[in-house]
A protein has these predicted regions:
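Charged, often low-complexity linker/regulatory segments
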Residues: 1-43, 153-174
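Domain-level recognition of nuclease-like catalytic cores that cleave nucleotide substrates
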Residues: 2-9, 120-159
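Active-site metal-binding core of divalent-cation-utilizing nuclease and nuclease-like domains
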Residues: 22-24, 48-80
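Structural motif
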Residues: 27-30, 176-191, 254-255, 273-278
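Conserved catalytic cores of phosphodiester-cleaving nucleases, focusing on short active-site segments
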Residues: 36, 66-72, 80-92, 108
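Nucleic-acid nuclease catalytic cores
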Residues: 93-138
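Long recognition/docking surfaces used for binding and targeting
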Residues: 195-292
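Conserved S-adenosyl-L-methionine
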Residues: 301-327
Length: 327
């Protein structure tokens, strides 16, 4: 039997590591770590051979373990060759957490002389860069494979999203936590930006994207304000005119420039247009279900129930297309 025809079974309570292929315990933390390990390979372009999980980090006489480390190309998997360090936490862990927050990542970066970038992921996502004088500063993202610095994406850089649900969740959490808005209001602002993102992908005539922000812009207040006033607000004006039955004539983006900059940096490298419809549907259902329907006792039918029903019906009838969601 060829290797291509072998199906590896994963026992309950386990998850297969996308880097090593070995089984690991299925926990909320491990799920986040595996999502980001996969993202490093499929979206950022790093080879699996340069990535390692649970890497020992020596800090004085103590030793800690970094969740994920990307090493210099082809280098040994040792602390002295660390290029990027990632700390991946459960979706409910805040960056301000004293034990597992962003300070933990910064301490690992400070202890690793060759580490240039870091990424902390939990309830939100934050990237950091070590400057020439050794200071660790905020940056929009970590660089892609083969690049020295993060940059503003172009149209050809857009990739399909494999875990859109987590991206939407972090964005909504950030708007709700930092924008001074209630959950329903935060959802509506998120909806505006999703429409802006799709419109920019579909209607942009050049390789330049409006729904994008560069590292220098994100570091300055004037850059963030320029993003809002010169790119996103005009983009939303076009969206509003195209969808007058969704958005009112006097609506505009209500977010502060700093909050908007975070959302754009989270979504700018993904293609909502090219992402699989089921992935988009699952992400949207969770976003809507958490914010608009539960208080009225209304919920989306679970997707596994939908899939099961469709398969049962398909085995009974020969029609090419059927839907079980007519309520």
């Amino acid at each position: 039997m060829s290797e291509e025809n072998i199906v590896y079974l994963v026992p309950p309570g386990s998850i297969r590591c996308c880097i090593t292929g070995k089984l690991r315990k299925d926990t909320p933390e491990e799920n986040v770590r595996q999502r980001w390990a996969r993202s490093l390979v499929e979206e950022y372009g790093f080879p699996r051979s340069d990535i390692m999980l649970e890497v020992p980090i020596r800090m004085g006489i103590a030793k800690k373990r970094a969740d994920i480390v990307v090493f210099n190309p082809g280098a040994k998997h040792v602390q002295e060759e660390a290029l990027i360090i990632l700390e991946t936490k459960r979706d409910d862990v805040k960056a301000s957490d004293k034990t597992n927050g962003e300070d933990q990542l910064k301490s690992y970066m400070a202890a690793s002389s060759s580490c240039k970038y870091g990424l902390w992921v939990g309830q939100e996502r934050f990237a950091f860069e070590r400057s020439q004088d050794g200071k660790i500063e905020s940056v929009s993202d970590i660089p892609r494979a083969g690049e020295d610095r993060p940059r503003r994406p172009e149209r050809t850089d857009l990739k399909v999203a494999h875990d859109l649900t987590a991206i939407f969740r972090r964005c909504h959490n950030y708007i709700h936590g930092n924008g001074g808005l209630q959950k329903a209001e935060a959802f509506h602002e998120m909806l505006k930006l999703i429409f802006c993102k799709v419109y920019d992908e579909e209607e942009g005539g050049s390789d330049e994207l409006n729904f994008a922000i560069g590292p220098k812009e994100q570091r300055s207040e004037s850059g963030k304000r320029r993003l809002l006033e010169e790119r996103i607000q005009p983009l939303f004006t076009k969206v509003r005119k195209r969808y007058p039955y969704i958005f009112k004539d006097d609506e505009h983006i209500e977010l502060e420039p700093s909050v908007l900059a975070y959302i754009v940096s989270e979504m700018q490298f993904i293609s909502l247009v090219d992402t699989d419809t089921d992935v988009k549907g699952a992400a949207y259902e969770e976003l809507v279900g958490q914010n608009l329907r539960g208080d009225r006792g209304e919920y989306f039918t679970p997707r596994n129930v939908c899939d099961m029903t469709v398969r049962i019906i398909q085995s009974m009838f020969e029609e090419a297309e059927l839907t079980d969601l007519c309520s």
